[in-house]
């Protein structure tokens, strides 16, 4: 009887340790570098953003142009078909949807919505203005919330927006490298 109780306690303890173990495995899995064909990784730490993202490769599209704006947004432009901005925020998709509905200039249509992503298009009826496609993505990286969207000042086609979304979904946490002055 004592042996049975001991074996039962040993098995129960093993399950308890496994179930209550450290969650580092999920963190490691989310830190894997996702490769996209024709893209290369861009580390954003030098602009104060502890993350990296896959952007179209420089060989075929030109060097990434990265600018930290006065309002705190990090704008990344590569060639003519890639332009995004990343900034701290709440990532409130519902608020954006309300803004789109109440817009007095544009007629907006939501094309697709996921938990952290909104894809929409805007048009000014009978104006001759080309339909604009946009996206808004909410990313939580190292417990900070970031809002990522296409550059509103540019015009991108639907396929360009889809390609940017694929790149944005590769965002991952990359801690800043320690320097001698940190010690």
What is the predicted function of each stretch?
Residues 1-2:
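N-terminal secretory signal peptides that target proteins for export/translocation
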Residues 5-8, 15-72, 151-183:
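N-terminal targeting sequences that direct proteins away from the cytosol to non-cytosolic compartments
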Residues 65-159:
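Conserved polar/disulfide-associated segments of primarily extracytoplasmic proteins
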